[in-house]
Design a protein with these regions (language model features):
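Hydrophobic alpha-helical segments
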Residues: 1-171
């Protein structure tokens, strides 16, 4: 199932050898199930904003349900990773007290996958999106659902490496 990782590695330039080696390690040897690790990678790729990259990853994943859930998570986190830090940065109690009035149904519906997996995809996208509030909420949520610290670490590792890949791709 992870043949796409080998294809991706071929596009990474030699100056990014660490990234090339890390992409293999974080996905193929993750503590997460393979399908989940791949979809975590896709959610992170989506969050990088490199549409050529994430659409390619989306196209090569075999599990369409997980792939679609990952981009759904990436999409809603693209909104929330901006909205929640904005509220905090504005530092206005009146603003904080107002409802967001933004649709967030994807979170309640889990993008067609399990709640746990959708949370993992949201965490990956939020790590790349650098939203402290979203990272903390999804990290704590997953920990409460039984994810180990090793699994949570691996979500972070996948997100970090996919972010790096998005910056070094030349093809």
């Amino acid at each position: 199932m992870t043949q796409w990782v080998d294809q991706l590695k071929e596009t990474i330039p030699d100056y990014a050898k660490d990234t090339k080696l890390n992409i293999d390690a974080v996905i193929k040897r993750s503590s997460l199930p393979v399908e989940e690790a791949e979809a975590v990678a896709l959610a992170a790729a989506f969050a990088t904003g490199n549409s050529k990259f994430w659409t390619w990853v989306h196209s090569v994943l075999e599990n369409r349900t997980e792939a679609d859930a990952a981009v759904t998570a990436g999409s809603i986190m693209a909104q929330n990773n901006v909205w929640y830090p904005y509220i905090e940065m504005a530092d206005d109690e009146s603003l904080k007290g107002l409802p967001a009035q933004l649709r967030m149904n994807a979170i309640a519906q889990h993008g067609g996958t399990t709640k746990e997996r959708f949370e993992a995809y949201c965490l990956a996208a939020s790590i790349v999106g650098k939203c402290h509030f979203c990272v903390k909420a999804h990290y704590d949520g997953l920990k409460g659902m039984g994810y180990s610290v090793e699994q949570l670490r691996d979500i972070g590792r996948i997100a970090a490496v996919m972010n790096s890949v998005s910056k070094v791709l030349v093809n």
